[in-house]
UniProtKB/Swiss-Prot annotation:
Covalently attached lipid (N-palmitoyl cysteine), positions: 17
Assigned protein family: Belongs to the BMP lipoprotein family.
Organism in which the protein naturally occurs: Borreliella burgdorferi (strain ATCC 35210 / DSM 4680 / CIP 102532 / B31)
Subcellular location: Cell inner membrane
Effect of residue 179 to L: In strain: 297
Example of a GO cellular component annotation carried by this entry: plasma membrane
UniProt cross-references to InterPro entries, sorted A to Z: BMP_lipoprotein, Peripla_BP_I, PnrA-like
Binding partners and assembly: Monomer.
Protein name per UniProt: Basic membrane protein C
Amino acid sequence: MFKRFIFITLSLLVFACFKSNKKSIKSDKVVVGVLAHGSFYDKGYNQSVHDGVVKLRDNFGIKLITKSLRPYPIEGKRLLTVDEAMTEDAYEVQKNPLNLFWLIGYRFSDLSVKLSYERPDIYYGIIDAFDYGDIQVPKNSLAIKFRNEEAAFLAGYIAAKMSRKEKIGFLTGPMSEHVKDFKFGFKAGIFYANPKLRLVSKKAPSLFDKEKGKAMALFMYKEDKVGVIFPIAGITGLGVYDAAKELGPKYYVIGLNQDQSYIAPQNVITSIIKDIGKVIYSISSEYINNRVFKGGIIIDRGLKEGVIEIVKDPDVLNNRLVDEVIDLENKIISGEIIVPDSEYAFDLFKSKL
């Protein structure tokens, strides 16, 4: 009887240990949240994020929670400010047992600091963060910035060499000050190739109006007489491709975030590839594998790190121009060319040529 009691007791202990172990394995599953401003299927910025986190899910079996900010003003909550609405959406994602939380876009810069201090149990990553200045990045947070001006310089050089007109177009959303690194890098590339060319800059009132983007692009091509347009305007920017296709193969576009030549094969002369998904995948996979998160810092990425690059298709450009772009690329990586990211830096850049 005593032996039977011992056997049953041991069996229960083994079973209990098995159940406990099974539970701990389940709790070890990493949960990653992603909050973005706009659709994850924008064929550009957010699409790159989406591709990176889906690859992460498929390769590591993580639980992935994605959410797009609700269009503002929010129906039924019109008294909410933009910041309050963003915070509500972030809290909604944080109802899940998150390990990592990625906030996509400069709009989340201030919010990421607030959330990090409120929830020290979650690790945060902010893509395209503001310059925090004297503000210390929290230990459980990581700010990632990109040297967008480097690839924009190469795009500007290509635009100047390919344009059949004396003007180049630059189309942004309503908050254009947040893409000034793109603008002045692009402007510097144009100036480096041909100082006589002029940059025509326009601001769209929204990032979500494709028809407005098309109308503005048609005006820029036909009335402003630009030969190339570089749009940084979200969904609105996709309207530029429609306008270029409608007008014909002599009207050029520069793609952004992904190789966008498939959208308008006869019009896209190059694309800036900004592989945000690659950065998110790299940092997240390091955490998943080692349970290590190196927070409290700002990470800077550009051409040298292979995160940003420019498409150099010899069938579109020509071999000579491709060689010139590769040479400029190497000079930027080596530091021989310092690309400006502001108006002051651009004026300094011009003075040294």
